[in-house]
């Protein structure tokens, strides 16, 4: 068990950057060359997990070690929701962050991992503020939207980030006497609801993930209030991964400059083939 403030401090260092999914050492090197602040090591990007079906589990430790060996930036890896043994294995490998991820098949449909029991910081997804505060209450040091990973469709990530912002503004404007009832309705820890009321933000960094496929998508999430962006299938399922990766990194840095966004969006080749979000939703996994 370690200090949550230290874990949050490590997450704060990723602000204003891009975290990229990679499935091998070569992709990890491309991501680092493009300016990624971290990589997510996994065997299959979410688009392939959707296409292949079956049970998606933690990646092979050999793959994770290979990716860690070629990059000097932080390496994240995914564990299934509730699968604390996968998390123990990942921590033993020395990964920098663990993502308790809805992209993988849940191992426990009632309980998430008790993240306070680990020294490594955890990333968790959310669709609304109540879900975010529950994960933070369990020890998460970094929150992201769930979006709909593997679709190239930004609509769910936008909906979820707007909902979190709406919920934060509601609590910020509430009377202090209403906070306990709000905590009850949101199923959120009371002390965290009080924090949001006082500070008007989450107590941990708030990133965006799920469906980011273009520089414009990344800039959109930043303008909506995300502090960094995860990109999964959108880079290495595109025609020119290195060029697109560099463009998305630039878009996150200059998200408020339409001229630069236009420049970096030019001649990127075909993006990943997107799909609609009217099928099984990964974002409905977990609670």
Swiss-Prot record:
Its EC number is 4.3.3.6. HAMAP family: PdxS. In the presence of PdxT, forms a dodecamer of heterodimers. Catalyzes the formation of pyridoxal 5'-phosphate from ribose 5-phosphate (RBP), glyceraldehyde 3-phosphate (G3P) and ammonia. The ammonia is provided by the PdxT subunit. Can also use ribulose 5-phosphate and dihydroxyacetone phosphate as substrates, resulting from enzyme-catalyzed isomerization of RBP and G3P, respectively. Keywords: Lyase, Pyridoxal phosphate, Schiff base. GO terms for biological process: amino acid metabolic process; pyridoxal phosphate biosynthetic process; pyridoxine biosynthetic process. D-ribose 5-phosphate binds at residues 21, 150, 211, 232-233. It catalyses: aldehydo-D-ribose 5-phosphate + D-glyceraldehyde 3-phosphate + L-glutamine = pyridoxal 5'-phosphate + L-glutamate + phosphate + 3 H2O + H(+). This is Pyridoxal 5'-phosphate synthase subunit PdxS. InterPro entries: Aldolase_TIM, PdxS/SNZ, PdxS/SNZ_N, RibuloseP-bd_barrel.
